[in-house]
Amino acid sequence: MEDPIIHFYETFLSEYDPKLRKARGVWYTPQPVVTFIVRAVDDILKTEFNLPRGLADTSKIKKKVELQGTKGKHEKEFHRVQILDPATGTGTFLTEVVKQIYKTFEGQQGIWSNYVEMHLLPRLNGFELLMASYAMAHLKLNLLLTETGFKPTSNQQRLRVFLTNSLEEYHPHTGTLFASWLSNEADEANLIKRDVPVMCVIGNPPYSVSSAN
């Protein structure tokens, strides 16, 4: 059966709004290509960066970040292997990252949920410009995590996939015309752009000779 996410990109969007598709350079990345890229990144982390667990690494580093509303800085702890897909689309690359990491937990299902909350969600980041793709990325990731047996606690973090333009630099919140929810999305994305020491940028950014991105 054809993946409905693929159907959205390849059929629906091309018929519903071909101009938007062309203007934004939106094209679906074939699954074999996605799998190859994710496995390659995992292998490079192991062989070139001396991280035996690759994408599943849980080590942390410290970095000085700005305090909100002040000019001062404080030291904050981050996971070393921070992952970012700057053009998330429907979440194809991020879901493949989850699948790659999940393979390393074969026979350790009992610790998977804790790992997801403590060491996966805090470092899996995505930016997406189009609302429909953003919504489907959240749906796709949530469905996959449920399929893996992930059982969230009452303190579950949200998925760190945000509706934002990756090419916009961090800028302080101005509190102008945005609705509250959209303002929060922008604020959260800005913090990632400003503070998070991203180690792995992975994905397939949209391309068009005349792209409006």
Predicted regions and their residues:
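SAM-dependent methyltransferase catalytic region
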Residues: P4-N213
